[in-house]
Amino acid sequence: MKVLIVFYSMYGHIYRMAEAVAEGVRSVDGAEAVLRRVPETLSAEILASMGATEAQKQFAHIPVCTVDELGAADAVIFGTPTRFGNMAGQMRQFLDATGRLWVSGALVGKAGSVFTSSNTQHGGQESTILSFHINLLHQGMVIVGLPYSFQGQSTMDEITGGSPYGASTIAGPTGARTPSDNELAGARYQGRHVAEIARKLTRN
Ligand SMILES: Cc1cc2nc3c(=O)[nH]c(=O)nc-3n(C[C@H](O)[C@H](O)[C@H](O)COP(=O)(O)O)c2cc1C
């Protein structure tokens, strides 16, 4: 059973979370985690002006996802930073290339799940995940979130990402904060949870 983790990251937070999601997937017997990134759509000049050039080198070795790989996966977990409370345009562009999967119903009945990051605590993590879910529903996917059985999302001991909609991390106003242990635990939990549900959905 193949669980595809397809992400966009500009500064590395979503990449780090994607690695943790993959760990969670791999903790399920028979589940293979495949990490892919979506194509970059901004020019090198714009990326340099945004201070992304060095950061993106950390995950340049991850292969770029193809639409066929998306269609062939047993479950898909999407990771995107928030952009004004929505998914990043790079992810949007990738989704807009999947029309033929919609036509053929390739994703119907497969588990789909979303995780995110933002600079500020209330900067749109929930709206990013929930508006992403609309796309999954149009593709006929079965939406999987991050249940409250992941107790780390209820903690009052620290400022943390994570909601019933999906794992998340807060990068901080300058983007210098890295995903906390609790946020990474949420990402691992989500990966494991999706893989467990996908295993049930794919059982004959
Ligand atoms: C154009 C743009 C819009 C953004 N919009 C938001 C926003 O609405 N709320 C917020 O908290 N952070 C916002 N951010 C910050 C990003 O979400 C943050 O850089 C990202 O989550 C870090 O993830 P990454 O390291 O994987 O790129 C924005 C960043 C950019 C470049």
From Swiss-Prot:
Annotated positions binding FMN: S9, M10, Y11, G12, H13, I14, T82, R83, F84, H138
Domain Flavodoxin-like residue range list: 3-194
Binding site for substrate: W102
Keyword tags: Flavoprotein, FMN, NAD, NADP, Nucleotide-binding, Oxidoreductase
Cellular component annotations (GO), alphabetically ordered: membrane
EC number: 1.6.5.2
Highest taxon, organism lineage: Bacteria
A single GO molecular function term of this UniProt record: NAD binding
Catalytic reaction(s) noted: a quinone + NADH + H(+) = a quinol + NAD(+); a quinone + NADPH + H(+) = a quinol + NADP(+)
Required co-factors: FMN
Cofactor note: Binds 1 FMN per monomer.
Residues at which NAD(+) binds: Y11
Pfam entry (one): FMN_red
Enzyme class: oxidoreductase
Family: Belongs to the WrbA family.
Protein name, entry field: NAD(P)H dehydrogenase (quinone)
Organism in which the protein naturally occurs: Syntrophobacter fumaroxidans (strain DSM 10017 / MPOB)
